[in-house]
């Protein structure tokens, strides 16, 4: 499988996972997890708040080591594992902590994937970035 095909597959799986999970996460927290509206807001606020620190950390690590694709793979796997933990978190505090853990990894996947994609496509100029992401 070529690098371009791997990129297309990554973006397909990643965007499908985002589209399946995030539109319903807030609904799940409010209806099935039994959180109040304020608690749902607090849990969902973990994503951007933790992302403020996590994105620069993972980006710096990837740039410093020069192993962007390896860091991207590790962060993506950890984000998937953290997402699985959400199914075992019951109550406000466990869901808050589990969502913060998810955010620690998940919020860095998109920026790193964009960086890796553009670096790969730079060497193979025949493919447009939009095609890889679609």
Regions found by a protein language model. Name each.
Residues 1-48:
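Helix-loop boundary and gating motifs at the non-cytosolic
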Residues 2-4, 87-99:
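Helix-loop junctions at membrane interfaces in 12-TM secondary transporters
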Residues 16, 20, 88, 92, ...:
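Hydrophobic transmembrane alpha-helices of Major Facilitator Superfamily
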Residues 18, 48-55, 106:
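Residue-level signal for conserved functional micro-sites within the alpha-helical transmembrane segments
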Residues 34, 66, 88-90:
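Helix-breaking motifs and short loop linkers at transmembrane-helix boundaries and internal kinks
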Residues 53-67:
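Helix-to-loop junctions at the C-terminal end of transmembrane segments
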Residues 70-84:
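Structural signature of the two symmetry-related core transmembrane helices
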Residues 100-133:
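Cytoplasmic helix-loop-helix junction between adjacent transmembrane helices
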């Amino acid at each position: 499988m070529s690098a371009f095909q791997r990129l297309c597959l990554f973006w397909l799986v990643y965007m499908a996972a985002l589209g399946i999970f995030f539109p319903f996460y807030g609904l799940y927290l409010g209806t099935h997890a039994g959180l109040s509206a304020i608690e749902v807001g607090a849990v969902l606020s973990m994503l951007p708040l933790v992302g403020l620190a996590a994105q620069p950390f993972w980006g710096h690590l990837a740039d410093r080591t020069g192993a962007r694709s390896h860091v991207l793979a590790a962060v993506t796997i950890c984000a998937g594992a953290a997402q699985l933990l959400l199914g075992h978190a019951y109550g406000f505090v466990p869901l808050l902590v589990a969502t913060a853990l998810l955010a620690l990894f998940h919020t860095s996947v998109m920026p790193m994937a964009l960086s890796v994609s553009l670096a790969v496509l730079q060497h193979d100029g025949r493919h447009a970035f939009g095609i890889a992401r679609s």
